[in-house]
Amino acid sequence: MKTPSSLIERRALLGLAAGAALTPALPLRAQDMARPSAQTGLEVHPLWPNGAPGGEQVTAQEQVILRTPSGDPNDTAYLHIRDPWLAVRRPARPNGAAILMIPGGGYQRVAVSKAGGSIDAGLADLGFTVFVMNYRLPADGWAAGPDVSLQDAQRAIRMVRARATDLGFDPARVAVAGFSAGGHVAGRLATAFDRDAYRPIDVIDQLPTRPDAAGLMFPVVTMMEPYAHAVSARALLGSTPSSAQRDAYSVERHLPSNAPPLFLAAAADDRVVAAENSLLLWQACRVQNLPCELHIFEKGGHGLAEVSTAAGPSWMRLLNIFLTRER
C-alpha cells in the first residue's frame, strides 16, 4: 500500500507530465484563489522585465487553471503564457549547484505552480538551488514561433547564473532538468546554445546559455515519425510540418560536439511519449562518444510515478548521483 507521502509524490510526478495526455481542468474560482497557498518563501521573478519579445501579434489572454476539479489550489497549469517567470527554491544545506527545472504540458500548457511542489522540494533537499520556469508556448502567435520556449529557456539559465553569487552556488554547476515536453525544451537548451534565440536586452544576456549537465525525464525528443509525440509536434510545428521542420526540431539530430553530459530516464510502458525518444538521443550521443546515461524502467508509465518510494522518485536519486559525479 502506498504511503501518503508516496501518493503526494505520484501526483507531483504526474503533474510534471501534465498536458501530454491533456486531461480536462477547470478555471480557478474566486474561492480557490482565496484559499491559503502552500508557498513557503519561494521568490518569483519575471524573465523579461519589460515584457517578452515578439508579442505584437499575441491576443490570447493568460489563464491559470486547476488541473483537477475542486483540487489543490496550488496544483495548477498555465495556458497562453504572456509573462513567463522563474520561481526560486533555496536549499537548507546548499551543495554549490543549481538546477533549472522545466515542467511539461505538451506545448499546450505548462503544469507549474508559484507555490512549488514536491519535486523542486526534493531537489532542494539534496542541496540544489532550484529554479522552476514557466514559459511561453509556440501556438500563441509569438514572433519566434517554435523557438519561443527556447528564448525563455536561454533567458532563464542566464538569470540563474546571474544569481550565483548571492545565492551561493557555482555558475559553472548549473544543470537543466526537463520533464515530458519540458524535456524537449531542456534538450534544445542543451544542444542549441551556440546561437542566441533572442536579441540581448541587458548585461545578463552576456552570460552563457550552455547548461553544465542536462537531465531529461520521460522526454519528448524527436519530431520524426514513428516516435514523435503527436500532441507536442502539432503544438510546436503545426498540423502539416515539412520534413525539414521535423528534422530541425528533433533534438537527437543536432548534437554539438561539446554538448553537456546528458541523463535520460523513461519507462518502457510509457503510452504517452514512447521510450524510444530517450533511446534515440542515447544512440546519437553514443555515435559521437558524448557522455550520456540512460535508465529505462520496466514500469512507471508517463511520469515514472510507479518507480517512486516514500524516499522519493528513483530517477531523482540517480540524477543526483549523475550530477554530483566527478568528471
Q: Which residues make up each language-model segment?
A:
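Conserved alpha/beta-hydrolase "acid-adjacent" motif
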Residues: V272-N277
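Mobile cap/lid helix-loop segments that gate and shape the active-site cleft of serine hydrolases
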Residues: I65-P73, V203, P219-H254, P260, ...
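Short beta-strand/loop motif that positions the catalytic acidic residue
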Residues: L264-A266
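Catalytic nucleophile-loop/oxyanion-hole region of alpha/beta-hydrolase
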Residues: V110-I119, M133-D170, V307-S314
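N-terminal secretory signal peptides and thylakoid transit peptides that target proteins
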Residues: M1-P24
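Short beta-strand element of the alpha/beta-hydrolase
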Residues: G96-G104
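Primarily recognizes the serine-hydrolase "nucleophile elbow" in alpha/beta-hydrolase
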Residues: R158-A228
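C-terminal catalytic histidine-bearing segment of alpha/beta-hydrolase fold enzymes
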Residues: L279-R327
